[in-house]
Amino acid sequence: MNDIQIPIIFTDAAAKKVKSLIEGEDNPNLRLRVYITGGGCSGFQYGFTFDDQINEGDLTIENQNVGLVVDPMSLQYLIGGTVDYTEGLDGSRFVVQNPNASSTCGCGSSFSI
């Protein structure tokens, strides 16, 4: 039995969407990279990109044979969080539910600690 605690949850909905987006690409090594940058109305901002590189120190989480990659600097702000994919009246997007954020902006794409 594996008791290793995964610091971020990569939901089935997010993994399914990543899988559908990369199926049309000619690169089986693509993964979703989530990262934190300075900016946004609350001080920090979430970013998402597709990446086929895994750098030293990156955390990789697999779900449904697709990967989520987080760099060490961003990981410290995302521990305990969830990367999800939502569809609703305000559109469809990848979202981060972050228990470390003391406040978030209305659109949910930036936060403060």
Curated annotation (Swiss-Prot):
One of its GO terms (biological process) is iron-sulfur cluster assembly. Binds 1 iron-sulfur cluster per subunit. Keywords: Iron, Iron-sulfur, Metal-binding. It holds the Pfam family Fe-S_biosyn. Disulfide bonds: none annotated. GO terms for molecular function: 2 iron, 2 sulfur cluster binding; 4 iron, 4 sulfur cluster binding; iron ion binding. Iron-sulfur cluster binds at C41, C105, C107. Its cofactor is iron-sulfur cluster. One of its GO terms (cellular component) is cytosol. Belongs to the HesB/IscA family. Homodimer. Required for insertion of 4Fe-4S clusters for at least IspG. NCBIfam families: iron-sulfur cluster assembly accessory protein, PRK13623.1. This is Iron-sulfur cluster insertion protein ErpA. It comes from Actinobacillus pleuropneumoniae serotype 7 (strain AP76). The lineage of its organism: Bacteria, Pseudomonadati, Pseudomonadota, Gammaproteobacteria, Pasteurellales.
